[in-house]
Regions:
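Ligand-binding pockets and gating/stacking loops
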Residues: 1-169
């Protein structure tokens, strides 16, 4: 699928794509890489070692595929440089801790967009920017209420849209 997306961008058939590697609610089992159960059932692992290993394999596979996509974008010239530099790609999950459906501290990666002002080379943990935050070791509570209530996922999406030239407030 990533090859088709690159081709669509390269030929200017579209400038926007949304692609899910699997439904957030189920996500397929991938027996070829040793993932025997769907992502949803694995996310409710309750600390089960086998489930956690399969979840890790699934995550690793998906990140490798995303890396492949970025590499392909970096090798295509769009006339002004690498296609990756004029593309913003977001990878991540709508849950930070699937065992309890935690929706804060989302694990997200923003890639590309160097040519439109996206700065890279850092890890941004919005919780660490909050006075009094003393780490994630305080248990599951951090996944249910954000430490930094001003760090909204919608702000990231808004910034991405604005960088791509969409006029929105």
């Amino acid at each position: 699928m990533y090859d088709i997306i690159v081709l669509a961008f390269e030929t200017d058939m579209t400038r926007v794509v949304t692609f899910n590697t699997g439904n957030e609610g189920t996500g397929p089992a991938v027996p070829e890489i040793g993932v025997k159960r769907d992502r949803h059932s694995l996310s409710h692992h309750n600390g089960n070692k086998e489930a956690l290993e399969q979840l890790s394999r699934s995550d690793e596979f998906n990140v490798q595929q995303f890396s492949y996509f970025l590499d392909r974008l970096s090798k295509v010239n769009d006339g002004g440089g690498a296609l990756l530099d004029s593309t913003v790609a977001l990878y991540g999950s709508g849950l930070s801790y699937g065992n309890s459906h935690g929706t804060t501290s989302l694990p997200l990666v923003v890639a590309g967009g160097k040519g439109i002002g996206i700065k890279h080379g850092s890890h941004v943990d919005y919780n660490q920017q909050t006075k009094g935050f003393d780490g994630y070791g305080n248990g599951i509570g951090v996944y249910h209420s954000p430490v930094n209530s001003k760090a909204h996922f919608s702000n990231l999406l808004l910034t991405m849209a604005q960088k791509m030239g969409v006029e929105v407030d």
